[in-house]
């Protein structure tokens, strides 16, 4: 099986398993209840990924952020750019991005409310795409369009699936192993198939403090595991919490959880 087909099958299998566990249809905008959590000061000085990207991207360039979310990367990078084009399909995320841009007077950002494969944008100097690809089924078309629209491509992703820390809980709660999404290892295989030789840099980030309380842990884990109140799965989850969580530095984290750190995968498309 080719690397691109393997990628697509992993995404489809994970999505099918998720759909099978859901008790209700997902909302049209899956970020509507959480978009406000992605607000961030564009001029913050404690974000190692932002600092890394600002050093790597020369000032005065036109930048494209594909899957820009609430602007956590797009707005800080816009401060040094000639122009920032932020492509984002979620209406609630676009609203947050526009609000934060207005609040902090960042005026050189064009928001394109669209999926990437449908978006119509001009060619830019640099395209960035952070923590988006894990769920993209047509990975080849997605990457090729990035290459067609940028002199340099910078993809940010973890060395493992973003939710991999809770995969062991999935089996304990549901009785079956969690089917993983693809991440960095599979992406490098895809790039190899596409004859791309990227540079890969690790951005060392501090561990997340975790959940603020056991109650917040229960609520968030239940949502991520598609567990509903008063169900046998919720009963199992509640019984497991004190076994699988440890209190550390004022928060609760999953014991033995992998420390996910972003990798910046960059290359200059040929031609």
What is the meaning of each model-derived region?
Residues 1-57, 61-69, 152-179:
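Conserved class I S-adenosyl-L-methionine
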Residues 180-195:
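Short alpha-helix
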Residues 126-138:
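A short SAM/SAH-binding and catalytic strip from SAM-dependent methyltransferases
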Residues 199-271:
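Conserved Class I S-adenosyl-L-methionine
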């Amino acid at each position: 099986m080719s690397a691109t087909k393997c990628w697509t099958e992993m995404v489809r299998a994970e999505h099918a398993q998720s759909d099978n566990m859901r008790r209700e249809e997902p909302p049209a905008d899956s970020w509507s209840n959480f978009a406000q959590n992605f607000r961030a000061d564009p001029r913050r000085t404690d974000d190692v990924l932002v600092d890394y990207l600002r050093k790597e991207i020369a000032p005065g360039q036109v930048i494209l952020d594909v899957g820009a979310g609430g602007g956590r990367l797009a707005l800080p990078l816009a401060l040094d750019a000639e122009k920032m084009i932020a492509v984002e399909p979620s209406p609630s995320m676009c609203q947050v991005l526009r609000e934060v841009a207005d609040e902090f007077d960042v005026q050189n950002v064009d928001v394109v409310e669209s999926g990437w494969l449908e978006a119509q944008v001009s060619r830019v100097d640099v395209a960035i795409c952070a923590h988006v690809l894990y769920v993209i089924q047509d990975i080849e078309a997605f990457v090729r369009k990035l290459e067609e629209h940028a002199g340099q491509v910078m993809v940010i992703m973890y060395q493992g699936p973003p939710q991999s820390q809770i995969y062991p809980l999935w089996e304990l709660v549901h009785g079956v192993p969690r089917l993983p999404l693809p991440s960095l290892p599979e992406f490098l295989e895809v790039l190899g198939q596409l004859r791309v030789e990227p540079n890969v840099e690790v951005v060392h980030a501090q561990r997340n403090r975790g959940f603020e309380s056991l109650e917040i842990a229960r609520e968030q884990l239940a949502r991520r595991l598609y567990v509903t109140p008063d169900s046998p799965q919720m009963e199992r989850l509640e019984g497991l919490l004190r076994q699988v969580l440890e209190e550390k530095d004022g928060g609760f984290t999953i014991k033995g959880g992998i420390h996910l750190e972003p990798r910046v995968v960059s290359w200059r498309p040929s031609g």
